[in-house]
Amino acid sequence: PQADDPIALLDRMDAAAVRAAAAAAPSVRVPLEALGLPADLGAAHVAGGTNFRAHGDEVGVDEPFLFPKRVAPTRWESTVPAATRLDYEAELCFVALRPIRGSEGAGDLGVVLCNDFTDRWLLVRGMLLGPGVMGTRGFADAKGRPGFLPMGPFLVVPDDLERWLQSVELELWVNGALRQRAPASDMIWAVREMLARALADREAYRYAGADVPLLQERGVLPARALLLSGTPAGVIFRAPN
């Protein structure tokens, strides 16, 4: 990691020391376009599907599920590659600040705004429907193309993540039109439950022609890996009537 990487900084200093250093430092103005990725991050992540009830209703899926998101994040203003049926999904990316082995590790997560882009045509052709299999086929390929994980420039590390999330609202706008809006509190699986399910997962997921685990080391969410929250209603795709 770079010397100014915030995750490396938090590994060396506690939150109080970081706040004290920030308060003592002079203010600096930085143009928005100069801001890049907020930290050095990995390329093997865990994502939640239909974790907002209204989004599950609009796509015809009843329960949340998990799947691997095997792609490196890109800058917030990066061009997204063209796809047959490209779709957006505004999400919260929970960032592991250190290796996490239990749901109590939810306190070791930061948060970044991200977009879980999808090739819906590739997804629909490859997915399996039904309890226990949702997410195991189609999702990793349809959401794992290079450039399909643009990320905001700000890493937020709350003192109390779960309390902080009660005040967060997700919005996505397209060409001046509001498409998605929901409070983070609408998540069906809260972050602690998502984390527990990911750490306990033993399923095989199809990606790039091979079976892969949800986590590269089962039972461990490694430092710099992401846990994606799922998205609110308002995506382009709709289930047929």
Residue ranges of predicted features:
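N-terminal non-catalytic cap/leader segment that marks the start of a structured domain
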Residues: 1-65, 70-71, 77, 171
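Catalytic-pocket segment enriched in acidic/His residues
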Residues: 16-20, 26-28, 123-241
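A generic local secondary-structure boundary/capping motif
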Residues: 35-37, 56, 79-86, 92, ...
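Fold-independent oxyanion-binding glycine-rich loops
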Residues: 48-51, 69-71, 90-91, 96-99, ...
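Short catalytic-site patches enriched in acidic/histidine residues
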Residues: 54, 65-82, 95, 144-159, ...
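Hydrophobic alpha-helical segments and helix pairs
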Residues: 64-119
